[in-house]
């Protein structure tokens, strides 16, 4: 079995903040490229995540790094680790 001393690696992704209208929560759009199984062309796929922003520091357009956490609510199980770049005002 696995020891409790081993630290589990947490999933970390980068994305763009598309909404900060909720209190202490931001919506992050994460885009990735996947190869089409038949035609081989790379296509964009995206997903929206709800992330915890304790300081309400993020604004729309910011690029942020988020990491997975234990669920905080029905849809929120990510946390903003850092703001990689600010949006141009």
Swiss-Prot record:
GO terms for biological process: translation. InterPro entries: NA-bd_OB-fold, Ribosomal_uS17, Ribosomal_uS17_bact/chlr. Keywords: Ribonucleoprotein, Ribosomal protein, RNA-binding, rRNA-binding. GO terms for molecular function: rRNA binding; structural constituent of ribosome. One of the primary rRNA binding proteins, it binds specifically to the 5'-end of 16S ribosomal RNA. This is Small ribosomal subunit protein uS17. Pfam families: Ribosomal_S17 (PF00366). One of its GO terms (cellular component) is cytosolic small ribosomal subunit. It comes from Xanthomonas campestris pv. campestris (strain B100). Belongs to the universal ribosomal protein uS17 family. SUPFAM superfamilies: Nucleic acid-binding proteins (SSF50249). Transmembrane segments: none annotated. Part of the 30S ribosomal subunit. The keyword Transcription does not apply.
